[in-house]
Amino acid sequence: MIDTVLPGSGHDIPAGCREAHWPLENLTLAGLSWHTSVDNEVRPPVLMVHGWLDNAMSFKKLAPELAKYAGVHAIDMAGHGHSGHRPPGYGYWLMDYVADLSELIDHHFPESERFPLDLVGHSLGGIVCALYAAAFPERVHRLVMIDSLGALSRSAKETVPQLRKALQKKRNGSAPAAVYSGVEAAAKIREGGLSPLSPEAAGLLVPRNMRSMGDGFVWRTDARLRHPTALMMTEEQVQASLASIQTPTLFVRAAQGLLANHNGLDKRAELIPNLTTVDVPGGHHCHLDGDTAPVATAIKGFLFND
């Protein structure tokens, strides 16, 4: 891991943590690392992975609580925050995120071969962490999924229409980048997204996803993140991956989250052999927005009760 403070980025680095870089073979992941006095040989670190179009600041409130017990590293996934973008011609497939996480752990957290680490993922990050835990159970001590319980699925008959849609979008490309007068204007737009945020939460999350351009600001996030993926998992594949998770797992279910009324959720939950479910108040960003204490209490109790 390479510790740095990026020029001009100090406004979005919370007290008690530092900017970090983790070089991979084809790009460099950035993120935030929270200081702890706990020896990694006593308590393995916690890796935190955010949701789609978010960044490491998603864990600004939760990470300091966990750092009282272990080293905490929140990554910006590829194409998000301060991390590198995929090369031209490439997209952002789900399994590529899992490959990034695998490479990150292998190269920068080799101690996990002896002391399995903890994974905490929100939304897409929870999906990525769950797939990694299914593939490499020996490297994961405990898994936490916040408002996340397996990948979005499509029926097999939707394979070709999905492929067509993805290839057409790849050929047509992205729309020109919107330019905002200030970060606050972009944050206002983000408040009304698919998963709405309060002004406070949007103000915490958005600056790390922005960069200056001329007299204004544009999204730093890769526009290709909004392109449809060419291939999605079937429900049978999702269920098989969840059934392969051997590590103790916590599902944090938000009362007003995206999964609150999701059909088929009980079936997925039943497939994970060692699953604990906790219900918390709040929306999809229950770990960042509003009263986050119930989420922090549940996760601390789950991760550090041994």
Label each region the model flagged.
Residues 175-232:
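Conserved alpha/beta-hydrolase catalytic His-Asp/Glu region
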Residues 134, 142-178:
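Flexible "cap/lid" loop of the alpha/beta hydrolase fold
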Residues 35-84:
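Conserved HGGG/HGGXW glycine-rich cap/lid loop of the alpha/beta-hydrolase fold
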Residues 121, 125, 129:
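Gly/Ala-rich beta-loop-alpha elbow adjacent to hydrolase catalytic centers
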Residues 1-46, 67-70, 109-113, 300-306:
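Alpha/beta-hydrolase fold catalytic core
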Residues 283-292:
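Catalytic histidine-centered segment of alpha/beta-hydrolase-like enzymes
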Residues 246-283:
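Conserved loop-alpha-helix segment in the C-terminal half of the alpha/beta-hydrolase fold
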Residues 13-14, 25-27, 32-38, 73-120, ...:
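Active-site loop/oxyanion-hole signature of alpha/beta-hydrolase fold enzymes
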